[in-house]
Each structure stands twice: as C-alpha cells, then as structure tokens.
Amino acid sequence: GLCPMIRLTHSVAIDMKTRLFITDIRKISFDRVGELSPERAERVQRCRRADDKLRCIAGGLFMNKFLGGAKITVNEFGKPECDNGLCFNISHSGSYVLFALSDSEVGCDIEEIRFLNGIRLGKIVFCDNEMKLLGNAFDRLGTFFELWTKKEALLKCMGDGFHRGAKSVDVSNGKFSENQTEYYMKQYKFSDYEISLCSVQNDFPKDIEFIIL
C-alpha cells in the first residue's frame, strides 16, 4: 500500500548504505501503542480495522527504533519530512510492514500477490512500454505486480506520490530519469509478496532484513 516517502532534511554528516527491513504485524501487540508519539497513537486510534492498527503501530515502532526523536513536518504534497539527515519510507501489505532507510532519497513498496485482471488494470496505470512488457509476459500476474511495485516505489522516492499521473513514469527498464536525476529500482521476492526498492543511488542491499520490533 502507499505510504508517503519521508525525507529527513537536517544536514548531518551521515554515511550509510541503504537498508531494507520487514516485520510481521502478527508478532506485535496492541499495547505497544503506548510507546508511540501522541500523534502516531492518535493515528492508530483512527484506524478502524485491527490489522490497520497493527500496521500503523509497526510503522511507529520502526520510526522510534531508527529515527529516535526526530521532528516530522509535512510538505505541500503531504510528504512527511524529518530533521535528522536520513531518508526513509514505509509500505505495508497483508501481514507485513516494510521500512527502507537511507542517507539519500528512497521509496519502497510491498504488495501481496493476488489474482486480478492485470491487463484491465494496467491500461489505467501503465504507459505503452509497460503495457507491451505486460502483454508479452508469460507470467502476467507476476509481471503486473513487478511493474506496479516499481512504479509506486519510484513515485514515492520522487516525492510526488500519486499526485502525478502513474502513466507519467516508465519503469519498464528498471530505471527512470527526470530533471537530471537518475532513479534506480531493485526487486525482491518475499513469500507471496512482491517488493520493490527505488533509490537515487544504484547501490542496493542484497537482502531484506527481517526484524522483530
């Protein structure tokens, strides 16, 4: 699912590789909400479904663990920005929450692979090159989710989210260039999930790190 990309803007000397973490919300209890900031706890309370509450708690626990008490503000696109020099991004689907952490722009997306009409949906969100790739694919369902997660990770990395048209970016060859910035993408498989990570640096973690929060 789409969560906003979060950019931390304070100029701190940080030299770190991009890391990608995943956690299972079934290992989190509701009373962990007491560890969250008042703003995050209020957001948890606004969630109606139990699993949505747990996903929101997990996102807050990730931020606590890796960002400490960093101050978060929201820009004109609804993208949260933080003040300790790091960039991070959160995504969730099914029982899992994904957390990407870097010292440069980053976006991630996780989607549980489920049956759908990829061609019909693809016509709404994919550009011509992507539709050609999808139409020629042996595994159309898998290809749909590969393209979809790459596109969502890219848009989150760029900071535009879906305020711009999904067809305006082309992820068919695994990278995208705009305004003299190159965006690179890498894909990961995890159980029955498709995961994509996008970064302005072509230096990706080899593996996803599973973590119990």
Residue ranges of model-derived segments:
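Core catalytic alpha/beta fold that binds nucleotide/phospho-ligands
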Residues: 6-213
